[in-house]
Amino acid sequence: MLKKTYNSLLVRFPKEKSSQLLEWIKTEEDRIIWSGNTFKKKLSINSFTEHLNRTDLDSFAYFTPGNNLLTYGEVITNKSPTGSICRIIVNPMERSKGYGQNFCKDLLLWMKKKEKFNMATLNTFADNQKAINCYRKIGFKIVARKPRSRKLGGIWKDMIVMSKAISHRN
């Protein structure tokens, strides 16, 4: 486990770690929870590498001192000053230890430093209480509910849209 003191570990995600990340996505349900409808075809190293080549996408990670992948996430740049935080995932063996919360804080800090974002948004399943609690703890608020938005395990599920203003004051 990494030190509990808050010290940013955020780095750009290296494509050569893609296979380690994709090992965490074991089922179709895992894929939908993690990526929504981003990968309509089968998720593979090739489709994920193609995804990482998007010009509107910045991908980030945390690594352990032993260089094992700990977290992954993305910021999508829109034409507006709103950025979308997407595809947040924590190593399944390291969940519920605060890494997701610190990782999201670091993504927000990166967005603030870019000075082109004034709002961050994200989506999560309405019944994903752990994710909702994590995002609320760092200041996200629920701004919309999209009923029956995604099919998961044969059941249509509601999505929650959350947002947080990005202040440029010190």
Locations of regions flagged by a protein language model:
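Glycine-rich acetyl-CoA-binding "A-motif" of GNAT/NAT acetyltransferases
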Residues: N67-T71, K130, W156
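Short acidic/polar active-site loop segments enriched in Thr and Asp
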Residues: P81, F117-N118, K141
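Conserved active-site alpha-helix within GNAT-family acetyltransferase domains
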Residues: Q101, A126-A144
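Acetyl-CoA-dependent GNAT
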Residues: T5-S8, P14-S18, L22-R95, C104, ...
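Glycine-rich phosphate-binding loop
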Residues: G98
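Terminal substrate-recognition subdomain of acyl/acetyltransferases
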Residues: I155-N170
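Conserved GNAT acetyl-CoA-binding A-motif
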Residues: K113-N123
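Conserved beta-strand-loop-alpha-helix junction that forms the acyl-donor binding cleft
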Residues: L122-I132, S149-I155
